[in-house]
């Protein structure tokens, strides 16, 4: 018999029970396979590609992209949807760029939105930690990662090089809040920006700010890219944005959709309903005419939309049938 075989074998469960709290360990089959709840983004297209119907609760989401590609609009529309369900949202406005009028146009209830303006990245993470621990916040939006300046940068001279300070801040801060997120009912959105890598000749020359920590800790990463301008005659009235779930730990990743973001009022929800109604055959097309329940309701897309918007009862019927199909598809995924 080997010497090691003579050693007393201890019951691992009993040993853990004696030293640690029961909440720190469990048997694998005790884990409940619960469906992750989510907050709608206000866009059916985006909700669908997330695979969970929006921004996951108890998880970290990163929304990143180039300037004017719809990042802030998605975040604000998510705040509005959170409030519609009776939830409480907090915006950490590190950039100091919050537009009251635009938020109001997106149906954000300004009387219920809590806004904070932390001076440093450390202060921002302290606020996030405090808010999560209250157990009363449903959504936290951080705008933006690029503006989460480390305290060391405030104290340093302009000539001092502080390599990696931002990345270290993000790594430490996310490491602190991640364990809290696992037990919370709070969703967090970090808005981030793309930067050009210096001296990059091969591969993707773009990178997000703040190092690699957010990529690691985020359960969902959404990329936005401006695909085209939307024009009405010679006037530019909005942008068409390509939205991609670059990372998704809760559903299949790399799903893509295109959304219309109109200047001054965000997503065109009515258009999205019509898109899906046509896709699922709720609105049928024969030649140039569109039909609903065998009734002719519009010749061409523009007339179809005008007819639906003028008839609330008809639009409600189309919407309810369409959303039933969309939700049924999510259930069967």
Swiss-Prot record:
Query: Principal localization?
Result: cytoplasm
The record's SUPFAM superfamilies line, in alphabetical order, gives: P-loop containing nucleoside triphosphate hydrolases, RecA protein, C-terminal domain
Record keyword Transmembrane helix present: no
Please name the PROSITE patterns in this protein's record: RECA_1 (PS00321), RECA_2 (PS50162), RECA_3 (PS50163)
Q: Which GO terms describe its cellular component?
A: cytosol
**Keyword tags:** ATP-binding, Cytoplasm, DNA damage, DNA recombination, DNA repair, DNA-binding, Nucleotide-binding, SOS response
Sample GO molecular function, one term: single-stranded DNA binding
Which InterPro entries does the UniProt record give? AAA+_ATPase, DNA_recomb/repair_RecA, DNA_recomb/repair_RecA_CS, P-loop_NTPase, RecA-like_C, RecA-like_N, RecA_ATP-bd, RecA_C_sf
Q: Name one GO biological process term.
A: DNA recombination
Give the residues the record marks as binding ATP: 65-72
Instruction: State a single Pfam family of this protein.
Output: RecA
Q: Where is the protein found, in the record's own terms?
A: Cytoplasm
Domain of life of the organism encoding this protein: Bacteria
Family, according to the entry, reads as follows:
Belongs to the RecA family.
| Reported function | Can catalyze the hydrolysis of ATP in the presence of single-stranded DNA, the ATP-dependent uptake of single-stranded DNA by duplex DNA, and the ATP-dependent hybridization of homologous single-stranded DNAs. It interacts with LexA causing its activation and leading to its autocatalytic cleavage.
Q: What is this protein called?
A: Protein RecA
Please tell me the species this chain comes from.
Ureaplasma urealyticum serovar 10 (strain ATCC 33699 / Western)
């Amino acid at each position: 018999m080997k010497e090691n075989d003579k050693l007393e074998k201890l019951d691992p469960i009993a040993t853990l029970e004696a030293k640690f709290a029961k909440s720190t360990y469990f048997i694998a089959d005790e884990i409940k396979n619960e469906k992750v709840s989510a907050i709608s983004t206000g866009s059916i297209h985006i909700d669908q590609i997330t695979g969970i119907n929006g921004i996951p609760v108890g998880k970290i989401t990163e929304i990143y992209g180039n300037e004017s590609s719809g990042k802030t609009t998605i975040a604000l529309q998510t705040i509005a949807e959170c409030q519609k369900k009776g939830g409480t949202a907090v915006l950490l406005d590190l950039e100091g760029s919050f537009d009251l009028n635009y938020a109001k146009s997106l149906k954000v209830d300004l009387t219920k939105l809590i806004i904070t303006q932390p001076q440093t990245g450390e202060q921002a993470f302290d606020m996030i930690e405090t808010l999560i621990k209250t157990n009363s916040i449903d959504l936290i939006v951080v705008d933006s990662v690029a503006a989460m300046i480390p305290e060391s940068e405030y104290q340093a001279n302009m000539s001092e090089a502080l390599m990696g300070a931002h990345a270290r801040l993000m790594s430490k801060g996310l490491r602190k809040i991640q364990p809290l997120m696992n037990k919370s009912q709070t969703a967090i959105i970090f808005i981030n920006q793309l930067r050009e890598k210096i001296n990059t000749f091969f591969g993707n020359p773009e990178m997000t700010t703040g190092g690699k920590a957010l990529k690691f800790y985020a359960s969902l990463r959404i990329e936005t890219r401006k695909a085209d301008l939307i024009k009405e005659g010679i006037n530019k009235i909005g942008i068409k944005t390509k939205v991609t779930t670059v990372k998704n730990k809760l559903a299949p990743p790399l799903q893509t959709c295109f959304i219309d973001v109109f200047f001054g009022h965000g997503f065109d929800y009515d258009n999205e309903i019509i898109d899906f109604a046509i896709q699922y055959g709720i609105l049928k097309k024969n030649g140039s005419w569109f039909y609903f329940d065998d009734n002719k309701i519009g010749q061409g897309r523009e007339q179809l939309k005008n007819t639906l918007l003028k008839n609330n009862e008809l639009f409600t019927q189309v919407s309810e049938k369409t959303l039933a199909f969309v939700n049924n598809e999510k259930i069967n995924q």
